[in-house]
Amino acid sequence: MNYSVIMAHLNECGYKVSAIPSTTAEVGFLTVELEINGMPVTLWHIAVTELSKMPSFLLAEPSTLPRLAHTAFYPGSKFASICVNVPDAVSVNFECPELAFEESLKRHVSLLSQALTDSEWNTKELLREFEAGWLNIVEPDIPPFLCLTESETPEELCVLKPSKGSVGLGKYHLGYAEEAVPDNIFSPINQLLKNRQAAKGNGFVIPLSVLKPAPWKKDELTDWYLDLLSELPTNVQTKLTQKFAQKRSYEFWLIFNAQTPSGITWFGIHFSQKNAGKGRKTLPLKHSHLAEWVLEPFIVLTFNKERIMPWSGAEQSLTSKKLCLLDVVP
């Protein structure tokens, strides 16, 4: 692909584009220097031999900018990928690839401009993609936590260990409220509880009225958790400090749920003592107490209508609708 023509075209369109050679090609990368809302922004494109899709660009040095929605930053990397939605089909003329680059750049710049100039929109979009952001700080070898309650009030959970040698749901920690377990011994829930041992810890469901975007990096989790506690409603704060925080244990599982623009999201933080030999301790609620604990984010899976119904093709918004059946006789 002739990148000289592409560079010339983009420069004519007003972009400041430069080429960087690689070890194998004269043009290994393109860089595009921008200024958005007074902030310098640099985009990188990795050169390809031919176009099979819309050209993509990476955001360089994302840590120098505010946290931006629709970007994925990976610890240790100097770049973030940019998720540019393509609502309209684009016809790519392979004889004129420079037009595809122009269209792609327009979309990248438009997205970044909105994120950097409209903080309210950016925050809303970060909350919409909260689960993706949370997953970004969860270690790959940390299994999900299976929560069998969908309580909208603070609730204590019984936590069970994974079943030895199990696969699938059996290898997850499981939390349930005692009154939420059906008496029917043939129920799927009872089958999940069967032959499991209790964990040496306590679990609590904490509903949130205010949620902030997920931490960008795992080492931000401690401060993010304390900020989360400071925004709790009074009734939740009272139950947390006067009841839950009186429990002593070697480990805790906090299960949070909150409303986001994309629906109710569930996520969790596991607390384990750095030195279990010092005996059981209460749930850490202050920065000074957290020095003795290891915090590990994890994914929460729930058995509720919001998660299960779409798998079968059901639409939850129809639950409050009335259905009229008509029998047409020829």
Question: Could you say what each language-model-derived stretch is?
Answer:
Residues L126-E150:
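Long, charged, helix-prone linker segments
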Residues T64-L126:
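Glycine-centered motif in EGF-like
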Residues A25-E26, Q114, E129-W134:
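Defense-system signaling and execution modules centered on TIR/cGAS-STING-like, death/scaffold domains
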Residues K16-P87, L99:
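Compact alpha/beta protein-protein interaction domains typified by the UBC
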Residues V329-P330:
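Rossmann-like NAD(P)H-binding beta-loop-alpha module
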Residues P143-L326:
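Glycine/serine-rich phosphate-binding loop and adjoining beta1-alpha1 elements at the start
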Residues E12-P40, P297-L323:
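Short N-terminal secondary-structure initiator segments
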Residues M1-G14:
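Amphipathic alpha-helical segments
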